Amino acid sequence: MKKTFTYLSFIIFLGWFPSLFAGEIYVSLQGNDKNPGTKEAPFNTLNRAIKQAREWRRLNRPEVAGGIYIRLEEGVYAQRNSLFLRPEDSGTPDSPTVICAVDGAHPVISGGVAVTGWKRGCNHPAVPEKLRQKIWSVEAPLIGNRRVETRQMWVNGHKIQRAAQFPDGGLERMIDFNPEEQTITIPVSQNVNPKRLQNAGQLEMIVHQRWAIAILRVKSIDVKDGQAVVRFHEPESHLEFAHPWPQPVIGGEKGNSSFCLTNALELLDQPGEWFQEYPSGTIYYYPQADENMETAEVIIPALETLVTIDGTLSRPVKHIQFNGITFEHTSWMRPSYQGHVTLQGGFPLLDAYKLQEPGLPEKAELENQAWITRPETAIRVRGAEHIDFKHCTFRHLSSTGLDYEWAVTASSVEDCQFTDIGGTALLVGAFPDGGFETHIPFIPADVRELCSHITIRNNFISNVTNEDWGCVGIGAGYVRNMDISHNEVCHLNYSGICVGWGWTSLESGMCNNRIEANYVHHFARRLYDAGGLYTLSNQSGSVMRNNRIEHLIEAPYATNDRAFYIYLDEATDGYTMENNWCPAERFDSNRPGKKNVWKNNGPQVADSIKYKAGRINQD
């Protein structure tokens, strides 16, 4: 009798609490999008699974009650267009949509395509006779009716250097930078032989300019008397020579600014270098000694954005979580089409110039103006709430990894790994772009436009900024109530964690941001005017505490020594800096406000604080 009563009670319990049971949708590389999406008969694509979940919600099906779990089986899910999530895909607090791995699987969402059919030997006249049998070539894959064009290639999981002067002996110092003539003069030497590059139609110059780089497509090279005068294509030529900050330095404390020539078949002379000729699409590669091109896995990216989550202020996308997913292989093609000249943090300039008479109503001493755009990103989130990434991996991405771009609230990135990323690992918040001049305080009419209550916690970020050296580990612009804590951020070419934008002392909505217990190390490897922890502008009620910052690298091509463990850049105000450990009190403040408070920062901070910084509960 007791057993019967228990059984009946359980049945009644199920009837009254259907929300305990979630709907499940399965995706497998062996599946079919005509299947019902069950474990036994899964779908083949994530797009189809998302559509199924959307329909369940539209029809208010019983499967929605306890949430929808889209489970991906093992495999690489190649995307040929960005996965698009919209307000109709929203979950609820009691019924989220979770995109996750089946138990024990490690699914990958990829924008890459395999490159196969390599042939040994290259008879191109740009290649010296002695190297022709060492170089392999292949036609790039076709997608649609076009050969894939790329600036990135991975061989057996390792990113390969494009053919460049750089691995042949490091960067070289320029001789002159001439804004009036729009030219850069470089030496002719054993390392730099511009004569043989005069017919290299895809040649680029990487210019080292303080806290940023420029990538300029070379238009012409005129060689005379041991020097070469280089001119560049538009629009980047105008931008490079018109924008005052940052420009290359001539006559710096440590010499002139540096440069590197890259992307020419004539430079393909070292193992581990490659070049793609366009419009033919042919790829040339000089393999390393341990690589067998008949069996090597070679991947090039064919997509810039893997996932787009796009809502509005009135209809945000809500309650979607990614758990245990790897995102990899995205491209970044902007420099190939229009060059790449940035203001700071990897943000490309649309226009910039020096004011003949300084001053704006918002900033009387301002001497320059700049309009920027946003870098490409693997995952873009706009107009959203409760969009969470947990235990995910972001790798082999060519620009930004993940971008909470606009009007995102109550969202988190936790226990994730970001490695081998060309730009910034994580971007958050407004960096006003388009027609909004970037030095004017951004004060939106609706405060919901500001990203708020974003948590970035317990993540590992390493080897990012490896294409655009001026990017950062974590970059936050106009944000409020942000929590950046217990992350390890390392091996960066510029700054580690950067919060703030605008160079303004005025109130703008940035406030109550927390940078706590992070471990930042091995930064400023190539650029300077950097900070392990870096801030800009007025951010009332913000704190920077219990962080550990060390291994500030003396960038070999810097023209001065401006790099710091903590750097409060222009107009930083409203911060309390407390109990931050670093091996020396190497700090700087650039025209700060009056409400900053410094308490016990430097090598004297207790080990009990120092060793608690960084990730916790590491896998």
Task: For each feature predicted by the language model, list its residue ranges.
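Bacterial N-terminal signal peptides that target proteins for export
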Residues: M1-S9
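Right-handed parallel beta-helix
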Residues: K318-H329, E365, E385-H396, V408-G423, ...
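Extracellular polysaccharide-degrading/modifying enzymes targeting complex plant/algal/animal polysaccharides
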Residues: Y26-G383, D388-T393, G434-A445
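Short glycine/acidic-rich loop motifs that flank beta-strands on beta-rich extracellular proteins
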Residues: L59, N81-S82, S331-Y337, E376, ...
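Predominantly extracellular beta-rich ligand-binding scaffolds that present long acidic/polar faces
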Residues: R80-P87, D94, V98, N560-R562, ...
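Boundary at the C-terminal end of the N-terminal hydrophobic targeting segment
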Residues: L20-A22
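Extracellular beta-strand solenoid repeats
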Residues: R71, F84, V98-C100, V108-S110, ...
